Amino acid sequence: MTYRSGLTPILLLLVSCIPCIAGKPNIVFFFIDDLGWTDVGFMGSKYYETPHVDKLASEGTIFHSAYANAPNCAPSRACLMSGQYTPRHGIYTVGDPRRGNHTLRKLEPTENKTVLADGFTTIAESLGSNGYTCATMGKWHLGKDPPTQGFHVNIAGREWGSPSGGGYH
């Protein structure tokens, strides 16, 4: 299967936590933006072939009643990382909510933060304090660098979201 960064708006944030202490389970968590609930084989897709994801699903835990806390990537990710709803962390959208032609705007945009404040304890910080080494791979959009939020390994995540240079290559 070949992926091109412009082909689909899917965002992949993979958090892989490897235990440092024997007896703790490995945790591999996929947080994917714009993935429809039937866009993978194990959920019934007849169009997309996802054999590796299907295998992981058959051996792991699937959250069937989960929902996104926000309509797009950065606020959803901030909710997941902090355990807080959008009004608490203040990240409502990606970037400046006042973008676009202001004469066409029907509502005044809410003040928006673009960085998850250091005062929030992230899931990576909580796992790290319990003996896990945490990694993030993919889009970040929550501040300058994921290691400032508890991640020990960061591949491709920066404040602008995706890696510089235009893709995940």
Can you describe what each PLM-predicted range is?
Residues 2, 19-20:
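C-terminal multi-pass transmembrane helix bundles with aromatic-rich, positive-inside signatures
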Residues 21-169:
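Formylglycine-dependent sulfatase
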Residues 1-10:
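Bacterial N-terminal signal peptides that target proteins for export
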Residues 9-17:
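Bacterial N-terminal signal peptides
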